[in-house]
Amino acid sequence: MMRKPYHCLRSLGTALTLLLLPSLSSSPLLAQSSENVCRIGLHYKVLGEGTNSKSIPVLTVVQPFGPAAVGGFFPGDLITQIDGVPTTGLTKQQISELLASPVGEHLLTIVRIGSGTTARILRPSCKAPYALTERELATAFSGYSPMDQAKQQRTLSFSFESSAPFDWSQAKTFAFAPSEGEHRDLYDIVYGQIAGLLEARGLTQQANSPDLILECSRSDAEGGARLSLQVTSPSKLNQTLWSGTSSLPKGTKEAQLYARQAIPVMLQSFPYLTASQVGYTEQTSRYLYTGILYDSRDLSRIVDVEEGSPAFTAGLRVGDKVLRINGKPLSPTTVRELSSRYRNFLDETYRYRSAEAVRPEQAPWKSSDYGSIRKALEKDKYASVFSYLFFFRPYINETEQTELIFEIERHSETYTLSIAPVLRDETVFIPQ
């Protein structure tokens, strides 16, 4: 295969600059203060916006490991107040402005199924504008492992209905209808998924006198197999409080695997309806986390180490200079030069990609060429030191050992530290 010239990758400098731009939208993940870039880690929709004065925001996505997740927030939480300001009737822009205000913490009053009304603290995660997190670097160097860094539009065949008014804040317990028939194994998998999700939100599973009854059913229609989840109340058995329906693959094993993946997405906004049918943006992000923040002005400089992180535990501190990671020198240290080396790597290893893609770095690697990819990554001319973020993949590391060896300089002395990174999967499905 002829080497395809690399033309369409943005420079790493541009990519990193874009990553640091303030982002303030109707569903904010970032907030911006005058000095720092602050991350909130949540997405929301406004129920009833533009239809009446009782519109209210509901969380649709909580970013794994983000501030909202640390603060104990869950998808499906209704936000009734932000720092004492009622959210009823506010627009998306007004809610964004409240969440983006430059404060050390926000007090959010929420209504949650199973828990009623509670108040929780949301502490934004802030960093200097020149600080680069490993999350940002994994995105910038996505070509090392495209299967772990991707963003795509997904049409998941979900449909939702809600036909009876119900005070969900008063629901404390739930039970499942008996699993029977030839699809019992599928129902058991689905019920197990649902139980974990509902219990995490504060509901209790009990067989006697539950507040909610959940029942799964599989059906075959002209368009293919469908899986339906129906929620009723013993006091209103003839009325469906909430229902969700999804398509299913034909094979039994395929259907069970799909159910494991789809049910958490289907229940993201449960028990509220943000739309009858929903499209999603799938943001895939997996990388090895140590907790280091690098200086974009000199990438070898550590500008912060998250407290309690693997790097902090290993002894790395602010001001340390990283010389090598797993034997690879952290050089060059400028974004511009490192970008040039990275582009050369993508261009000169394109023959190892297994498929065409809109951007070459998005195509996966051929499994038969993993050895060649590892050899290329060892070449100093490519300066692939940040491939450590994907050290859990066989085309980066042929062993199962993910320990990272950092050689650092501190006060003119050289030290070698061993760090046990944590594999983070921050993949989310964001409803459009």
Give a label for each model feature.
Residues 170-218, 338:
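N-terminal segment of the mature soluble domain
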Residues 218-257:
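Amphipathic beta-strand/beta-sheet edge segments enriched in Tyr/Trp
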Residues 64-65, 83-84, 175-186, 202, ...:
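Second-shell loop/turn segments in exported
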